């Protein structure tokens, strides 16, 4: 008889620069569709493959906490901001797996664009030994357009038998309406003195204006 994992945790990493309604919709979808008691949002440090972020880590963390206030089951995990991790997803997941133990079900959220480049991630195949992947795909998503190695994993790892789900190694697509919100466009609007195109929680918008964040970024 298969013993079901006693703990199931959703994990959503990102720069959150700034956190906006699109992020919150994704986190809620992960929580609700997979019936998770907890979804942890992990703000990134300085990613190893990207330019420095626009807002300081302390500000991104403060905005994320404001955005999640009153959101049941959505919490902040700030470990990647410590500077002690590599910034690679596989290393973060390995640390969380050590903390939760082998029987916890971990779900790492990725977008369809991230899935399409998964084979370029650091030690990407090791991810499946550490967690499941929950994929936020847009309507009309075509798995046939994925790189062959990723498409093979997509086909082989589909989560179907939830009564006997292992702690890691499966893939599930989340059913979402389109989320077409650009953090770049939000920052450009804020640089012009705008309100973030209406995509920011009031507390986050007020924090940005109070601390004069994103004012130096040139509008795009």
UniProtKB/Swiss-Prot annotation:
It comes from the Bacteria. It catalyses: nicotinate beta-D-ribonucleotide + ATP + H(+) = deamido-NAD(+) + diphosphate. It is an enzyme of class 2 (transferase). The keyword Cytoplasm does not apply. Pfam families: CTP_transf_like. PANTHER family: NICOTINATE-NUCLEOTIDE ADENYLYLTRANSFERASE-RELATED, PHOSPHOPANTETHEINE ADENYLYLTRANSFERASE. This is Probable nicotinate-nucleotide adenylyltransferase. It comes from Laribacter hongkongensis (strain HLHK9).
């Amino acid at each position: 008889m298969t013993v079901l994992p006693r703990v199931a945790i959703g994990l959503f990493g990102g720069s959150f620069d700034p956190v906006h309604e699109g992020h919150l919709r994704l986190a809620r979808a992960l929580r609700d569709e997979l019936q998770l008691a907890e979804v942890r949002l992990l703000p990134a440090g300085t990613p190893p493959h990207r330019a420095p972020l626009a807002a300081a880590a302390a500000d991104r963390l403060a905005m994320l906490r404001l955005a999640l206030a009153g959101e049941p089951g959505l919490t902040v995990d700030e470990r990647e901001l410590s500077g002690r991790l590599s910034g690679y997803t596989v290393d973060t997941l390995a640390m969380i797996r050590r903390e939760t133990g082998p029987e916890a079900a971990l779900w790492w959220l990725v977008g369809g664009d991230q899935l399409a480049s998964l084979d370029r991630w650091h030690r990407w195949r090791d991810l499946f030994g550490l967690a499941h992947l929950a994929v936020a795909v847009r309507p009309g998503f075509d798995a046939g357009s994925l790189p062959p190695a990723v498409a093979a994993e997509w086909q082989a790892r589909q989560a179907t038998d939830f009564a006997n789900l292992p702690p890691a190694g499966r893939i599930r697509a989340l059913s979402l309406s389109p989320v077409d919100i650009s953090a770049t466009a939000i920052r450009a609007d804020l640089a012009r003195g705008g309100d973030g195109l209406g995509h920011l929680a009031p507390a986050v918008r007020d924090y940005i204006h109070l601390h004069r964040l994103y004012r130096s970024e040139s509008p795009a």
